[in-house]
Structures are given as structure tokens and as C-alpha cells.
């Protein structure tokens, strides 16, 4: 187990976010976030780096492209025990991302609540599922959280393990995340 140093948070459902942020802050975990989540974190008075500042690339296409960046996905997908991956990260100045907290745009809810085709289309999440897939694929090194109901389990796991997560916990969260992505798609 390795201590979580950096978390990427991008959530449409902001319920219980403050509770999670309190724990992450106490553990001195660096926060990276985008869009509305970044604004919410700042409003709650937590220190956070905006994704565009973190990557050095602005959000583009009216916010359609925020987290689809090699610095994000390299930091999530890198195998911590593979020297070539560590060399690539170092060469490109891509820090590891150890925790990914993402839930998706409410596509299904939007689909059932409006006939506005443009609104429906804009609620199809691209970056969120990509980050969740990446974190789930790399469950040996990265913890993925997809729903606020999992925050209490994560908080407990981090407290019991001094800011770390066990492989069993990461595996369980990864399985739930893959199921959510499959359902969302």
C-alpha cells in the first residue's frame, strides 16, 4: 500500500463532497478538479488546483474537453512498479494521480426530463467515463470512487490505513466502477 498523495475530483453529484474533502484535506492529499466541481471546492474553502492550470491546457469547446489530457491519463494509468512508466512520467512532468473521484453527467435523468436534443447531447459524459475506465484498469495503484454513497467507505479505509487503500478495497471499487461505466454506456 502506498499513501494517496493526489486526488482528481470531477463530480456532477456534489452531495457529501464537503465530508470527503475534510478527510482528504486532513491527510494532506492534493486536490485537482475541473469546472463546477472546482468552483464548489473553492466555495467550500478547500485548496485545489484547477485541471486547466494542472495540465497547462485550457478547457476548450465550451467545456467539452477538460480532462482528456495525457497528463491526467498518464498520471492515472502509470504502473507504479514499472520503471519505463516512471521514466515517462518524469520525462513529461506528469505526477501520479492516486485517487479518482468521478460521477457522470446525469444523461439518463436529462433524457427522461426533456425533449431538448441539445441539452440531452451536452449531458453525455466523455471525460468522466474515460477517467473511471483508466482508474479501474489500474486498480493495483489507483482508487476509483464513482458515487457519494462510497465516500463513507473510502473515509473509513483511509483512516484505518493511514491515508492508504488496500488492494481488496481498490478491487471492489474498480468492479463497481466498471459496472457503472457499462451501464452508463
Describe each region flagged by the PLM.
Residues 9-10, 30-35, 49-53, 78, ...:
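General beta-strand structural signal in soluble alpha/beta enzymes
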Residues 36-107:
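Glycine-rich nucleotide/cofactor/substrate-binding loop typically near the N-terminus or early
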Residues 18-21, 62-68, 131-134:
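Short, flexible, solvent-exposed loop/turn segments with mixed acidic/basic and small polar residues
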